[in-house]
Each structure stands twice: as C-alpha cells, then as structure tokens.
Swiss-Prot record:
PANTHER family listed in its UniProt record: ADRENERGIC RECEPTOR-RELATED G-PROTEIN COUPLED RECEPTOR, D(1B) DOPAMINE RECEPTOR
Organism listed in the record: Xenopus laevis (African clawed frog)
Gene3D superfamilies: Rhodopsin 7-helix transmembrane proteins
UniProt GO BP: adenylate cyclase-activating adrenergic receptor signaling pathway; G protein-coupled dopamine receptor signaling pathway; positive regulation of MAPK cascade
Residue numbers on the Extracellular membrane side: 1-41, 106-114, 182-205, 310-326
Protein name, entry field: D(1B) dopamine receptor
Keywords: Cell membrane, Disulfide bond, G-protein coupled receptor, Glycoprotein, Lipoprotein, Membrane, Palmitate, Receptor, Transducer, Transmembrane, Transmembrane helix
Amino acid sequence: MYQPFQHLDSDQVASWQSPEMLMNKSVSRESQRRKELVAGQIVTGSLLLLLIFWTLFGNILVCTAVMRFRHLRSRVTNIFIVSLAVSDLLVALLVMPWKAVAEVAGHWPFGAFCDIWVAFDIMCSTASILNLCVISVDRYWAISSPFRYERKMTQRVALLMISTAWALSVLISFIPVQLSWHKSETEDHLLSNHSTGNCDSSLNRTYAISSSLISFYIPVAIMIVTYTRIYRIAQIQIKRISTLERAAEHAQSCRSNRVDSCSRHHQTSLRTSIKKETKVLKTLSIIMGVFVCCWLPFFILNCMVPFCDRSPGHPQAGLPCVSETTFDIFVWFGWANSSLNPIIYAFNADFRKVFSSLLGCGHWCSTTPVETVNISNELISYNQDTLFHKDIVTAYVNMIPNVVDCIDDNEDAFDHMSQISQTSANNELATDSMCELDSEVDISLHKITPSMSNGIH
C-alpha cells in the first residue's frame, strides 16, 4: 500500500508537526540539558571540594606535628618540610577555593579581586615548587658531605634558604601583577576581563616565559641533577657496603668450614644489593615523577598560550589555541601536587608516629603506611647522627678483624663516609644504609687495630 510520508526526511516530518509539539520537545531538550549541567556541576564541585579539604588536612597535620613535638622541631631539616607545607596550605586557602567557585558557577563572581587572586596563584605555586627545589639541594648536600653539612646547616642557614625562595616568589608575582606587566596587551584580553565576569589570566609572551623559567624549568633542572647524583651516590655505596657484608659473612661462615654457606651468603648479599638499588631508584622516580606529571603539562601550555592564534585576523597569529577547559584541567593538576607533597615528604617513620598520636588512631595508623612513601623518606634520610658513621666502621672491623688485609689496596671502602639511612627493624648492620666519601674524615680499615684476637689470616 502507498504510504505518503515514507520518503520524507526528519526535517520535513517536523514541519508537519504542530507548534505545541515542537515547543514541548524544545522545552524537554532544554530541561535535559540543564539537568546534565547541574549534575556536572555537582560532580565537579564535589571533587574539587574533596581535593581542597585533603590538601588542607595533610598540610595542617604536618605543621601541627612539627609545632607540638620537640624532637621534630629540633631538627633543622624539618624547617624545609614546614615551609613546603605552609606554601601548599596557602595554595589550598588563597588559590583553590576561588577557582573552584568559578568552575562551578561558570564565571568569575569576585570582580576586581581577580588581579590579587592571580598574584596569590603565582606566588603560592612558585613558593611550593621552589621549596621542593630547596629540599632536593638540602638532601644532596646532606648525603654528599654529611660532616660538613652537620657543621654548616644551622637554623639560620635554613631560614636564609627558605627566605630566598619566598622572596623570589613574591618578586615574580605581586610586583608584575600589580603593575600589570603580566597582562597580554591584545584588545581581546582587555575586553574580556572583569566586565564580562571572566578572570582571564592570559600572560604576555615575555612574562610567561620568564616566570615559567623561574617558577618551574630552572628548579626542575636542579632537582633532576641533585636526585640523579643522589642515586649515583646511593648506587656506589650500596655496592661498597654489600662488598663488606659479603666479606664479613664469608669470614664468619668459613671460620666454621661451611663452604655451602659461604656461597649462599654471597648470592643473598648480591640479591639484597640489587633490591636496595631498585628501592632507591623507585623512591627517586616517585619524587620526580609526581612533581613532573603534575606541573609539566601546565607550564608547557603556559608558554604556548601567549603564542596562540586567538582569532582568524589576529595580528600575532601562531599556534592553535588550547581550549579553556583543557587549560583549567592542567591548572588543577598542578595544584593537586600540593595535596601529594605531605604524603611524599612527611610520611617517614618519625612523622607517622606523631600523626598516629595526633589522630588518636594508635596501632591502626602505624601499621597502614604507604610502603613506597616510607621507603622514600628512610632511604634518603638526612636527620641521622654522624656518630653512626663511626659505629658502622667499628662494627665491620669487629666482624672481620684481620681479613681486612686480604682486601685489595685499591679499594678503601671507608676512607670517608656519609650515611643515607639507618635500619632498626632486624638489627642488620647497615642493611639499608649508604655511605659516601667525604674529604674531611680519614677513616681507613687498615689503620684500625683489630679488637678480636682470634682473627683469621
């Protein structure tokens, strides 16, 4: 049978519908769109609120722990951890909430506060990154020259380093922003600012590149160099300690004529050495990986956006523009680093005990640490007593009193030492320790008188 409407497309069929039907469909689509928008706003707001509260909680916990417990407060190096926590706390207080409200509302509702907020954003983010850089330099200095570090790293020196980082953060934020040196001079930017409810933080090319160099690229280069050298020091000293452990175990085992035991000890020590090297590499990879993954995408875009072609007839045509949504996502990725720093830098053994005391969760808190984080702070420790260096030497001499003469003269394993960490779990001497040569101390196994009379020749 012939059907008169079977060859008509959807637009032609719609033209035959009554105005009431079309209006109802339009209202239905609009209602559905609003529901999806509200649902998206609720999800976005909830996630951002959770991120802000976690950042506040973690960094307040770090600051409270150091202020309330004297043994943490007495360590000079914890000043750097507190400074990092303060900068991250300011990110959560002065930067995140205002942007979160703007994300949910869909516009900037705070008017002229935009310029001050931009200055706070640049200052707090830069301070956080520079504090991470200072911590890496502090750790490298402590590991490469521990005795010199113990003498020269005073509270005054630490405060001077921190003050320099904060002063630089203020200089590249408030002064340029208040003098409007940071703004893009295009008509698009001038017309799309506070009057349209948009806090456009578009930067001119000169300021975008110079501020990115100071805030990120130079600090990340320093961190890569320092942590690479820390890994090399750790790798060398793990092998040296493993050599001494094998010699000591060989002497003790062969003293009882246990040949099979000698071979087993050698294989076990070699596996332990490889395991410890892997731990150090994993630790440093986490520290650098988290930092780079959070901040690198933003700073790449930050340098790209000023060179964008914003309109077809733009006089400074260049790269295609990045969408505002994409840019905002990577901005939040950078700020999220402030929520991860307390986990990475403060969750070592000492801090975990204090946190469990503050939170009142006792045994449950102390038995649920993140293992990788624990490794990161105990392998790269810089709060230990330098007397432990001498203890290691004495212990090894007691274990292998006269076997020292059998060691090749070219291998002065403990001419000068530096400690990276100290084990306490099973009393294995220097199992998780790493040593580094230091020109200020002359400790040689050949120069120490054996303390046991029944040594093996």
